[in-house]
Amino acid sequence: MKTLYSLRRFYHVETLFNGTLALAGRDQETTGFAWWAGNARLINLSGKLLGAHVAHAGLIVFWAGAMNLFEVAHFVPEKPMYEQGLILLPHLATLGWGVGPGGEVIDTFPYFVSGVLHLISSAVLGFGGIYHALLGPETLEESFPFFGYVWKDRNKMTTILGIHLILLGIGAFLLVFKALYFGGVYDTWAPGGGDVRKITNLTLSPSVIFGYLLKSPFGGEGWIVSVDDLEDIIGGHVWLGSICIFGGIWHILTKPFAWARRALVWSGEAYLSYSLAALSVCGFIACCFVWFNNTAYPSEFYGPTGPEASQAQAFTFLVRDQRLGANVGSAQGPTGLGKYLMRSPTGEVIFGGETMRFWDLRAPWLEPLRGPNGLDLSRLKKDIQPWQERRSAEYMTHAPLGSLNSVGGVATEINAVNYVSPRSWLSTSHFVLGFFLFVGHLWHAGRARAAAAGFEKGIDRDFEPVLSMTPLN
């Protein structure tokens, strides 16, 4: 360790008992980071870091392909997807592959193709990762200057940012092209209970698209999570894709302005912290989106949302008791409010009882029964269709509640089934991942700022209390 420029810089790094453990320019002595610090050893080895990233991409794509094939192998077409613990097939079905009217799976072959394509891609990425980690050049700056970089080269960093933005924009347009030209996507709002359709009449009005961003995030408003038609979703992807591509070109062609050079920390760890913050925000938004939105995440595949299951229960018992002779328009509940129907604070007719808090819910099986002032009493008496009764009874018993041991549904509900909704899994996992990414952002941002300010060091070992204590033996 005597070759280090400054020992103090590494006081917080646990030293190895065997200082001879060397990894060809990636050992603790030359990098200041021990083996468990992972990619930190590769901060200045762009070629090896490329290998780590490509191999990581290979692992991700391998999981996608393997899990995809696993779900195909276990899939039972007669049961709804959300009863089978599937999290990948619902995404493929939402994109319009293999499904027909009502979300019924008519062909599992596209799912098989998807899994195989991902597996083959992962093999290519895996080979590239191993090549660059073990055989390729350690650094790219000399032999491939276009792919080389220095972390504090602000112009190069914004060029890399621009390339990433263009790739994200292309990704957004892939969804647009799928919806417009390549078979369409699944629309849960299609007449007659959902179907795959091409989205022709895109919403491109900036006041509508950016109006979502200006909405309140709270009940009844719901910010961007409140989007409930595919024209807006696909139109939003046109806007997003265009902004990403033009922003990417802008960042490639320009250098950072003086205020940005002053305001930001320009180091590898700082960029890591910015990325973690962005991913954290994405995780939290995805959590709310999959929990509340039944247009981007159709209930036919993901199961009902919480509010949807609750309103479905109120609807199911309204149907039952109306058949038994109850006057649902005037029956009084135990609190003195309407038992089946009541008015919201703004005057709409809504379901009564505990589900009143979910009066915002919009769902394809319920909307036909609404009039200009909320639920329409005459439609509730005359127009309820058998498919609406079946759908609501199914959703009532599949609430997205449940513990890890798969005792799903409302704890007191005798008709609940043994299942956990994919909505529960996807929203809780994205919340937890978003939280940990945020903690990682705080950690790396703190370290990056400290390093930039020049006071990055661990506990000061020179004046550590234990040094003045009597030896144990």
From Swiss-Prot:
Keyword Hydrolase recorded: no
Residues the record lists as Phosphothreonine modifications: 15
Cofactor binding annotation: Binds multiple chlorophylls and provides some of the ligands for the Ca-4Mn-5O cluster of the oxygen-evolving complex. It may also provide a ligand for a Cl- that is required for oxygen evolution. PSII binds additional chlorophylls, carotenoids and specific lipids.
Lipid metabolism recorded as keyword: no
Keywords linked to the UniProt accession: Acetylation, Chlorophyll, Chloroplast, Chromophore, Manganese, Membrane, Metal-binding, Phosphoprotein, Photosynthesis, Photosystem II, Plastid, Thylakoid, Transmembrane, Transmembrane helix
Molecular functions (GO terms): chlorophyll binding; electron transporter, transferring electrons within the cyclic electron transport pathway of photosynthesis activity; metal ion binding
GO cellular-component term (any): chloroplast thylakoid membrane
Source domain of life: Eukaryota
Transmembrane segments: 69-93, 134-155, 178-200, 255-275, 291-312, 447-471
Subcellular localization: Plastid, Chloroplast thylakoid membrane
InterPro entries: PS_antenna-like (IPR000932), PS_II_antenna-like_sf (IPR036001), PSII_PsbC (IPR005869), PSII_PsbC_sf (IPR044900)
UniProt modified residues of type N-acetylthreonine: 15
Function in brief: One of the components of the core complex of photosystem II (PSII). It binds chlorophyll and helps catalyze the primary light-induced photochemical processes of PSII. PSII is a light-driven water:plastoquinone oxidoreductase, using light energy to abstract electrons from H(2)O, generating O(2) and a proton gradient subsequently used for ATP formation.
Similarity-based family: Belongs to the PsbB/PsbC family. PsbC subfamily.
Name of the protein in its database record: Photosystem II CP43 reaction center protein
Gene: psbC
